A protein has these predicted regions:
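Structured catalytic-domain cores with a bias toward divalent-metal coordination
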Residues: 1-292
Length: 292
């Protein structure tokens, strides 16, 4: 059932409506576990759109297995998704820096407060993100160290390739994930793929993890997908490789593969002169290539 969480006219023109799709078993009303999937806070990140679609499709294909509530929020920033804009169009504001909001505040504070209020009561919330247009990332859970102990058991069930502790601003203060965790709703940030793009293989991998979590929580009684054991890293265990030259980077290895000491990772080339300006290799790689 599609429900409108909030609907408002924008001061600069246009209309903003945030909707959720609530899928629940028929005839069961009380004491149901609930999972919430949130996507589209940044309108240029489309990987979560596929995950929302595929989760809803699988649930509706076998409604007899559903024993809890699945809430799907495909577009928290619907205007941004319409225009493939990271920020809220016309306002040029990053929605993921406005939580938990204020019911008595300005327009965007009221919107974010309403979203938070609608998510309270969830047994788990998963906030879906993609990388930017320049980087493709393997499926990974990003955790703040403040909540890592409580969230790690859930994170291991997501079927992600990696769990990255304290990795990014997407889990820090004023974000949806940080606010919901402070309010007692376990919330994971899942990041994968690339901006302005959808990778079905990554999406299917994470949807399998979502159904594994739902099975463990008693929300889903159908076949339980198997999940892999993720690598777990902190900031100090992730190697960043930066070029010393300008130009175009051409990778020479596959995404998400192990590398050995001294392996050639890629080249920085000059398209004007037809020359290689720098060969990128790493003498001390300890993990897989996570991004490309």
């Amino acid at each position: 059932m599609t429900e409108t969480i909030i609907s408002m006219e924008l001061p600069a023109g246009g209309h903003l409506a945030i909707r959720r799709n609530r899928i629940r078993p028929e005839g069961e009303e009380r004491n149901l576990s609930r999972i919430s999937l949130v996507s589209g806070i940044h309108g240029d990140e489309l990987e979560g759109q596929y995950i929302c679609y595929e989760t809803a499709r699988r649930v509706k294909e076998h409604p007899e297995y559903l024993k809890g509530i699945v809430d799907i929020y495909p577009a928290l920033n619907p205007l941004g998704i319409d225009m493939a804009s990271r920020t809220v169009p016309r306002l040029d504001m990053d929605m993921n820096r406005m939580f938990p909001g204020d019911a008595s505040g300005d327009m965007m504070e009221r919107i974010t407060a309403t979203v938070v209020d609608s998510l309270i009561g969830s047994d788990i919330c998963i906030d879906l993100h993609a990388s930017d247009i320049f980087v493709r990332e393997i499926p990974q859970v990003r955790l703040s160290e403040d909540f890592a102990e409580a969230l790690l058991p859930y994170a291991k069930m997501t079927n992600a390739d990696m769990i990255w502790m304290n990795a990014t601003a997407t889990v820090h203060e004023s974000t949806l994930a940080h606010s919901m965790n402070l309010l007692g709703v376990p919330t994971l940030v899942l990041e994968m793929g690339q901006g302005h793009d959808i990778h079905r293989s990554f999406g299917n991998q994470i949807v399998d993890g979502i159904f594994h979590i739902m099975s463990e929580m008693g929300i889903w009684t159908g076949p339980e997908p198997k999940v892999q054991e993720p690598a777990i890293s902190s900031d100090g265990e992730v190697e960043f490789i930066r070029s010393k030259s300008d130009g175009v980077f051409l990778p020479l290895i596959e995404h998400n593969h192990y590398v050995k000491k001294g392996d050639l990772i890629g080249e920085v080339v000059d398209p004007f002169e037809g020359t290689v300006k720098q060969q990128i290799s790493e003498m001390c790689i300890r993990d897989r290539i996570l991004t490309e």
